[in-house]
């Protein structure tokens, strides 16, 4: 895909992260929730909470499997270890520290991992440009190899990332749905000391995203220029690390690669276990007061089950093409309707509980049908989002809303500034 992949960071991350910091994170803190499905349950109905948690949990299991496969592929490229062996070993390693340590361990390890990734990535860029004769020679070689890789926006008939789909499906739907409504992302902000800390962290992360495309896309372009023969496109980065960098730096970057993928896994395991315990079992079991010790034990057992399910799925990931496209396709199944619920629930007081449930369930069914007919994932996300908006508006006119008093802390109000008060957010 080339430089066009950067749209998933610049267009597909930074604006949505700012939106999350200014609107949705303060809203979640004021609502006093621990998870995104919990907010949807308060804003709409407990049934919406269960369905949203179930859909998100299933996706997280698949996403964890994708990350495990990517780690195993990196190990095979760098060390020659078989992919099945890498899946089992890394699944056990990540499971031990994420299950035993919880969110605090995840936050600490992620902070270290990010530092390693950025430092090692900058070194890859510097050495890569030096080896190819500088930026001008690198661009010329890339132009000869594949001119489309220098295009920021691909043609409208591109099978994977057409420019209208990027602007509509990515910028309008998939990006804000992920950064404003993903439990694995927002669990860190919901676990911060104060609402101000949570929003400030998201804004700081948005600034860091400006450099991410350079660190992610450049190694793939470098592998193309150097005429690397790769079995999978996802082998580009570990190939560059192994064949271009000197031993010490190569090992550092290898650790950074593993760390980045581990971050995806530990976040998914922790957030999914939380949703299953609180948002699915808690609602279906009609529990009003959480049982801390019992929930902790259950959460660890569920985490093990999630990891085993992901390990079972991981060997099949290679049959679906690139991992990035696979993840976006899975997200397009449900993020259109889910973001419609979040947007209408946060910005309006008219969306009703019945409307939210109908829009979410039928919207996911519509997305699956559209993907089944071969429609591009980006268009699927946008069409299902628009459909869900229409359903919410229509059904809300026919069904009763929540009491006005219940909506005061569940809808966005202008002037509700982010403060350093810890009280509005969930108990820490």
Regions found by a protein language model. Name each.
Residues 1-428:
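Membrane-embedded helix-loop-helix hairpins and adjacent transmembrane boundary segments
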């Amino acid at each position: 895909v080339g430089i066009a992949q950067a749209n998933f960071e610049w267009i597909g991350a930074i604006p949505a992260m700012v939106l999350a910091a200014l609107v949705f994170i303060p809203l979640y803190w004021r609502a006093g929730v621990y998870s995104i499905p919990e907010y949807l349950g308060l804003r709409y109905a407990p049934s919406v909470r269960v369905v949203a948690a179930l859909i998100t949990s299933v996706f997280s299991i698949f996403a964890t499997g994708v990350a495990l496969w990517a780690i195993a592929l990196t190990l095979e490229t760098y060390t020659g270890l078989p992919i099945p062996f890498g899946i089992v070993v890394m699944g056990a390693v990540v499971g031990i520290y994420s299950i035993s340590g919880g969110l605090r361990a995840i936050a600490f390890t992620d902070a270290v991992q990010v530092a390693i990734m950025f430092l090692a990535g900058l070194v890859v860029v510097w050495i890569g440009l030096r080896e190819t004769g500088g930026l001008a020679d690198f661009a010329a070689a890339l132009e000869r190899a594949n001119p489309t890789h220098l295009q920021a926006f691909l043609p409208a008939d591109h099978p994977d990332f057409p420019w209208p789909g990027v602007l509509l499906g990515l910028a309008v739907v998939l990006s804000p749905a992920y950064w404003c409504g993903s439990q694995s992302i927002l669990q860190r902000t919901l676990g911060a000391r104060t609402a101000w800390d949570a929003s400030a962290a998201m804004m700081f992360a948005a600034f860091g995203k400006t450099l991410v495309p350079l660190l992610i896309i450049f190694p793939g372009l470098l592998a193309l220029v150097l005429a690397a023969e790769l079995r999978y496109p996802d082998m580009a980065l570990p190939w560059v690390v192994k064949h271009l960098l000197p031993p010490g730096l190569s090992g550092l970057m290898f650790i950074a690669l593993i760390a980045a993928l581990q971050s995806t896994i530990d976040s998914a395991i922790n957030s999914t276990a939380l949703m299953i315990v609180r948002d699915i079992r808690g609602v279906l079991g009609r529990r009003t007061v959480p049982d801390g010790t019992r929930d902790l034990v259950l959460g660890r057992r569920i985490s093990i089950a999630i990891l085993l399910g992901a390990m079972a799925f991981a060997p099949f990931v290679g049959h679906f093409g690139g991992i990035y496209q696979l993840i976006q396709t899975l997200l397009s199944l449900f993020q259109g309707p889910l973001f419609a619920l979040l947007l209408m629930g946060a910005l309006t007081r008219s969306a009703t509980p019945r409307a939210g449930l109908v829009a979410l369930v039928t919207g996911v069914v519509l997305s699956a049908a559209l993907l089944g007919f071969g429609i591009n994932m980006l268009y699927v996300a946008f069409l299902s989002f628009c459909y869900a908006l229409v359903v919410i508006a229509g059904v809300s006119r026919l069904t009763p809303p929540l009491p006005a008093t219940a909506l005061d802390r569940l809808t966005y109000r202008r002037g509700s500034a982010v403060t350093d008060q810890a009280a509005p957010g969930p108990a820490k």
